[in-house]
């Protein structure tokens, strides 16, 4: 019997009418079924470590990050190694969440640059820091990363909007450009650079994978990355002799 509802909102039970000659039969016993799921002992334990959110820090500075007039440098962001000590990764892939960078650029005039009257010339130039995603990382016959000119056509293009050359667009794409137009009247000038680049969001995830051929090669270096390496290109263009020294810290947030 199911309760019915009248117009006032109260409930009453409708009485079923049975004939007087109705013979009642004792209901037979029915098997009771337990539909609740019970834990199964046949499931195999998952020995694979759980992925966790981590952050890896890296500083790029030193003699190899000093640029002369109208020159460029190519570098890459190191990924975590496969291992137990953090920051690490537990599998042959990681999810890239966000890349932050912060640092300084020091512009120094070359002592040989001097006007006829003995005064120091004014330095005007453009400094660029470009983050590029390499979909299919591998080194060419030269054993080096693609140069700034090979990837963007020419260093002079840093004065305008940079774009990857048509021959390399299937492999590379620009993720972020930090540009500073500088005018230096003194011997030296310090400039701050800072940026934050989201690599994954709710709709799209950016995964990096590794070759990990053997135990000794399970590193986070460029040569061991098989998909989505992060490259950094520095470029310094000036009309008078001057050098640019960079000290930039990178923090990569990832799940691995």
Curated annotation (Swiss-Prot):
Protein name from the UniProt record: Nuclear shuttle protein
Membrane topology: Peripheral membrane protein
Motif (Bipartite nuclear localization signal): 21-42
Ranges of biased composition (kind: Basic residues): 17-39
Subunit composition and interactions: Binds to single-stranded and double-stranded viral DNA. Interacts with the host nuclear shuttle interacting (NSI) protein. This interaction may allow NSP to recruit NSI monomers to the viral genome and thus regulate nuclear export of viral genome by NSP.
UniProt lineage: Viruses, Monodnaviria, Shotokuvirae, Cressdnaviricota, Repensiviricetes
Subcellular location, principal: host cell
UniProtKB keywords: DNA-binding, Host cell membrane, Host cytoplasm, Host membrane, Host nucleus, Host-virus interaction, Membrane, Transport, Viral movement protein
Residues spanned by motif Nuclear localization signal: 81-96
Region (Disordered), start-end ranges: 1-53
Pfam families: Gemini_coat
Leader sequence residues: none
Compartment(s) of residence: Host nucleus; Host cytoplasm; Host cell membrane
A single BP term in Gene Ontology: DNA transport
GO terms under cellular component: host cell; host cell cytoplasm; host cell nucleus; host cell plasma membrane; membrane; viral capsid
Region (Interaction with Arabidopsis thaliana NSI protein): 150-187
Family of the protein in this entry: Belongs to the begomovirus nuclear shuttle protein family.
Job description of the protein: Binds to the genomic viral ssDNA, shuttles it into and out of the cell nucleus. Begomoviruses use 2 proteins to transport their DNA from cell to cell. The nuclear shuttle protein (NSP) shuttles it between nucleus and cytoplasm and the movement protein (MP) probably transports the DNA-NSP complex to the cell periphery and facilitates movement across the cell wall.
GO MF annotations in UniProt: single-stranded DNA binding; structural molecule activity
Domain of life: Viruses
């Amino acid at each position: 019997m199911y309760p019915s509802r009248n117009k006032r909102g109260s409930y009453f039970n409708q009485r079923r009418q049975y004939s007087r000659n109705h013979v009642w039969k004792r209901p037979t016993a029915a098997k009771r079924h337990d539909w609740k799921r019970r834990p199964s002992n046949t499931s195999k334990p998952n020995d694979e470590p759980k992925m966790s959110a981590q952050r890896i820090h890296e500083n790029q500075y030193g003699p190899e990050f000093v640029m002369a007039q109208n020159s460029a440098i190519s570098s890459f962001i190191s990924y975590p190694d496969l291992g137990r000590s953090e920051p690490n990764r537990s599998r042959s892939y990681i999810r890239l969440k966000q890349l932050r960078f912060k640092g300084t650029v020091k512009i120094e005039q070359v002592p040989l640059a001097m006007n006829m009257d003995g005064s120091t010339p004014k330095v005007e130039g453009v400094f660029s820091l470009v983050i590029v995603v390499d979909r299919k990382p591998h080194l060419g016959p030269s054993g080096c990363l693609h140069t700034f000119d090979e990837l963007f056509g020419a260093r002079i293009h840093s004065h305008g909007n940079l774009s990857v050359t048509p021959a390399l667009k299937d492999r590379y794409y620009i993720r972020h450009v930090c540009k500073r137009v500088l005018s230096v009247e003194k011997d030296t000038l310090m400039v701050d650079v800072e940026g934050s680049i989201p690599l994954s969001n709710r709709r799209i995830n950016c995964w990096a994978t590794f070759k990990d051929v053997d135990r000794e090669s399970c590193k986070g270096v460029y040569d061991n990355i098989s998909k989505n390496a992060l490259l950094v290109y520095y470029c310094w263009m000036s009309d008078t002799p001057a050098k640019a020294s960079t000290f930039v810290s990178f923090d990569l947030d990832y799940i691995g």
